[in-house]
Design a protein with these regions (language model features):
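Extended, folded cores of ATP/NTP-driven motor/assembly subunits in large transport
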Residues: 1-230, 234, 239
């Protein structure tokens, strides 16, 4: 019996065009800057500090131009703890601590922030508003160098506001940290392999089905929280 399921190549569906000067350029000419985020330790933030963090996010987002997208991703990957072996001699307490948690399951957490500059046309794209009707392939706005320069300036302001808050640290990712090198896996490679390891990962089959997403033998569980539905700090405190 012939298999009627259609298989797509990752190369054909891959949405990224290139990474230049630490900026991700999509095939739709969207411009994205990526950050690694360092958050406060769990249960260490008071109510007033949480309010201040919330205000910092709002203040930082207001400096971004129109048609910008702010995407904060929290990756939680279930792993088993492995003792650190850096070659240094460990004390009795340190060695006992490492052995106590050896091979215990835990959630490895990593947080990333993506700031994207898109266009008005992307938000109103329809089947009758294709490139065949427009007469040009890329939006005129995105080909304007001044538009890109203004966006990057606003990104720097965003980073400065968040770092000055004293609770959250943003570190902009360089090109090699996004694309990877021969020795170290980049963000894209980690994303496609569901791994936080710095060593180069082996890419596996990606299965996308209704109600199920899987990469190799790893399953995905996704939760999306939109800004206009996100609870305020006071709502979280009262719940």
């Amino acid at each position: 019996m012939r298999n009627v399921l259609k298989a797509e190549t990752l190369e054909r569906r891959f949405p990224l065009l290139s990474v230049e000067n630490g900026c991700i350029v999509s095939k739709d000419a969207d411009l994205t800057v990526a950050f690694e985020v360092e958050l406060p330790e769990l249960y260490t933030v008071t109510e007033d500090e949480y309010e201040a963090m919330h205000s910092s996010w709002i203040k930082a987002m207001k400096v971004l131009p129109e048609h910008s997208i702010v995407c904060k991703q929290d990756w939680f990957i279930q792993e088993t703890y492995r003792p650190k072996s850096d070659g240094e001699e460990q004390s009795f307490l340190t060695r006992s601590y490492e052995l106590h948690f050896n091979e215990r399951p835990y959630l490895n957490h990593r947080c990333y922030l993506f700031l994207t500059k898109t266009t008005r046309e992307r938000s109103r794209r329809r089947s009758d508003f294709s490139t065949l009707c427009r007469g040009f392939l890329l939006p005129r706005e995105i080909t304007d160098k001044d538009t890109a320069a203004r966006f990057l300036e606003s990104v720097e302001q965003f980073e400065r506001i968040m770092n000055d808050s004293g609770h959250i640290r943003l570190r902009r990712l360089e090109t090699d940290e996004i694309t990877g090198t021969e020795e170290r896996a980049g963000l894209v490679e980690k994303y496609l392999s569901l791994s936080l390891e710095d060593e180069s990962a082996v890419l596996q089959d990606i299965c996308l089905k209704p109600g199920r997403m899987r990469i190799g033998d790893k399953r995905l569980c996704l939760h999306t929280c939109l800004l206009y539905t996100s609870p305020s700090p006071r709502d979280v405190e009262e719940s």
